[in-house]
Amino acid sequence: MDKKTLYHIVEWAVALAACAFLGYKLVTFEDYPALWESLRSMAWQQYLALGLCVALMPVNMAIEAWRWRTLWNGDATLNGANGEANELTDERLTFKEAHRQVYYSKLAGVITPWRLGEYPARGVLLTNERMNELGSERIWPRVLAMGAVGSATMTFAIVLAGVPAIMANGEWLMANGEWWIAVGVILLLLVVGLALAPRLLRQYAEVSYGLIIKSVGQSLVRLICWCVQLALVLWALEAFSFQPSAISSLFIYYLLVTITPNVPIAEVGVRGAWAIVVFGSVNAAFAGVLLWVINTLLPCLGWFFFRKK
């Protein structure tokens, strides 16, 4: 069996495993009657808000594709494992390729803790499609290096926005010193890691501080898109008002979800539990479920439409 066939098998194995897991989550969800009752009693304006949230899903995915393409194409060379530089010509990712890889990576994300499988999944698809041009020994070091940078910059953006939000509107957390210790440790590790990234990763990829700053900016754009989606779903379920304190709670919610240890089987429950804590409404838990369907389930299904024939 050649490498390309092996990667093709892995590609479909991940897709089928993710579909099985998503099906399990849908079948075992126990609150369909209450969720249906909440949806059935909504006015047309609330349905419109849900529709806008769904419409923002492809925008969200396009932002992540933009972010991933920027990371991969961030400099003029593609370094191999032995450190030699190779000029990039046709080896740059197109937006279409990055877009397809981002959709596929959602499948791996739902079956791995903290969605750690997303960037390796992009490597699987990239290797499957570009094996002849690049070779797996040149793709994987860069995928893993840029994946580490991408994960760190996204987390840094969430912490960067979430900490001021807590300080402005998080009295219930301000009194809890353990949360501040956890957030402080995470922030310190992120700052140190990103500061050292150009030196630590130079054998595998050219990572500049300019690229890191650009990725943080793109991550903030994606976070804002998430917050708008969450606000729309919460408002549709009568669990949100567009007040400054409520808006800051959106950033607090994503910070808490991000720093909470999580496994795939408990992800929906964790998101729902934090939604109740932050927004103070049982309907907020349903908002977390609906947003999971919109931003996780739909993109997973979307890969079957965007995949390369």
Annotate each predicted stretch with a short phrase:
Residues 108-110, 251-272:
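Transmembrane alpha-helix interface/packing and boundary motifs in multi-pass membrane proteins
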Residues 129-142, 282-290:
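Membrane-interface alpha-helices at helix entry/exit sites of multi-pass transporters
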Residues 98, 102, 133-151:
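Alpha-helical membrane-spanning segments of integral membrane proteins, especially the hydrophobic core
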Residues 78, 90, 99-128:
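Extended non-transmembrane interhelical loops and adjacent amphipathic helices
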Residues 112, 116-117, 148-156:
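Membrane-embedded alpha-helical core segments of multi-pass
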Residues 1-102, 151-262, 281-309:
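Predominantly cytoplasmic-facing regulatory/coupling regions of multi-pass membrane proteins
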Residues 118-127, 263-279:
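Re-entrant/interfacial helical elements at transmembrane boundaries that shape
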